[in-house]
Amino acid sequence: LKFLLFLWLIAITLRIGFLAWQWKSLSAFSWEDIAKAFYIGVRFDGRIAAFMSLPLLVFLFTPFLSRFFGNIRPFLLGFYVIAFAFYILIYIADFAHYAYLNSRVNFAAVGLLEDTKEALGMIWQTYPVIKLLLVLVVVVAILTLCAKTILNKWVYAKNALSHKITSAVATLFVLVILIYGQYGIVYYPLRWSEAYFSGYNQITALGLNPIQNLADTRPQNFYVDNTEQARKAYPNTAKYLGVQNPNADSIRYDRFSQTAGVGDKPNIVIIVIESMSTHKSSLMFDELDTTRFLKQLSTESLYFPNYYASARTTARAMFSIITGIPDVNEYFKTSSRDPYTMDQNLVWNNFDGYTKLYMIGGNANWANIRGVMSNNISGLTIYDEGYWKSPRMDVWGISDHDLLQEANVLLETQKEPFISLIQLASFHTPFTVPDGIADLDYTIPNDEYLAKYAFDSKQEYLALKFCDYALKKFFESAKKSSYYDNTIFIITGDHGMSEVSPSVEATYSNLSLHEFQVPLIIHSSKYFPQAKIMKQTGGHIDIFPTAAGLAGVKVHNTTMGRDLLDPSFGEDRFTFIRRLNRPPLLVSNEYCFSNEYEQAGGGTLYKRASKDSTNTESTKWELVEGQDSELYLKLKTINEDLWQSAIYMLYHNAKAKANEVTNPTHTK
């Protein structure tokens, strides 16, 4: 029992450490919520402690094994040395994961290790690995010494049989309660969803245990068919998407269209900037000088301030952009890694007569993105490491500046109209910035200023300025090229960032909007000479349908993406956002519906305080009175229906099935 309590105390101590570390953000919440979350977390800690103590208890209280306990003890101690090492290693990873993503470590993080070279390289270049290993060794040594002391007392104790029986019964009783996780008369065991009672990420994080969370978020090895849920959701989804011939029996989302376009086969260049979070840019705060060029470019372009990544992490964001389906995959680590979602009918394929290009400074094998594109995009040419002449800068390959300069040279050589997707990576840990660039402003403000805008380090701030600089130099070069005049540039970020900025309203962060809001800029001095702020809301799934509309190509769209410039949808449209470990969001220019687990009330409706979406007040969202209103119920239904439809689309968007519909001889 002492050993069990010892293990429990370790976890509680680490939880207190997490509470102290995050107190600045947690102190904004009520004591009641903090206490409840801490109590739930302590119960999770007790469960993990109980499971960890099982090997010892089996040897102690099994009659034919206990007599050999003295001989078994060294091997048992060796087992716990290994267990302690993994235990502390998980907590180190958990704290690092939370520092970067504001969420406790989950199985999606394990998926990142599949790209072993990049993952280990990033860890080595970002974190003080040697110091952390020393901490690991010291902590494990201390825990092992304490465990050895407790085990020695048991070996040399001369207890009567009755005492051992009493101890065994008491320990078994405590063990059952701790594993069950409920310290009262409750007819179901402690479940992960109880930690989500508040609807706030910070409170939820306090209530979770990283080991339990890894187990709860592990991918399923099977797909749970949701056909019936998708069929029920179909009428609303079909109406929302504008399906021309809805058929609930076939559950098809086919839409056929062709706009006049803006010109004769304009080139399309899509640039996706790593972690280009709106709330860390000059686009939201004039005082910030992180993205001065991007700010200037927005005043010469179509600028969409109400634009959001459809999902978090780069792999999910890029899958959403490429396919037009929000990556809501909960059965595998990400859809790009799921063999059952590899066959997709893409709008990108509708660009007949276009040269299709994908460029990245590192290796295109990351997260199996190469597989997604090669399998689904006819005639695509991928340019990645090994092709570029510039030297490798860090784990992510060549720098954004070098990638964009070489991309410009490559685009200049194209003989046919082209559509190119360029993926940048410099604004990512370890935030490497080359030294000695003559016209790069290396000025970094003081720590107080950095904290005000949620920059964790001076290097992060400088890396964002370098990214903006790289973009500026690219446009300077592109304007001298032969392709520039007939090219439409679409610029966005893959996702936002997790750090909560004191400069935005609390509700904005509580809804996790800071993790998803990114800029969208459509630039063409020829086709859009007049700048305009586009108030309609959009998301990553809309990029290729919008590009197709601009190019005037014939489109067969079977996904959730829509043309942002299609006037038939109007300004009052919603975009769907898949959140990490929380139900999805539905956001418009005016409203935000936050779906939540039932423990957190089932959902909440907010209204933006300021309709001026470029104003800093745009991050202020106010609770709407009458949460049972017609609007609330409507948005809750749309949210649920789009969620089910997105899951269904992931597994039922095969190219062959889409081709059947386009075949003139095909009859429904």
Where are these regions (language model features)?
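General structural signal for secondary-structure boundaries
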Residues: L26-S30, L101-N106, E118, W124-V129, ...
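Alpha-helix initiation and N-capping motif
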Residues: I10, L113-K117, L208-I211, T227-A230, ...
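A broad, low-specificity signal for short, low-complexity segments enriched in glycine/proline
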Residues: R67-I72, Y80-A83, Y100, H163, ...
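Short alpha-helical "patches" and their helix-cap loops
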Residues: G70-N71, N226-P235, K333-P339, G561-R562
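The feature marks either
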Residues: D115, G199-I203, G207-S257, D264-K265, ...
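Transmembrane and membrane-interface helices of multi-pass
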Residues: L1-V224
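Short, highly charged low-complexity linear segments
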Residues: E114-G121, Q125, L151-Y156, Y234-A238, ...
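Solvent-exposed soluble domains appended to multi-pass membrane proteins
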Residues: G242-K668
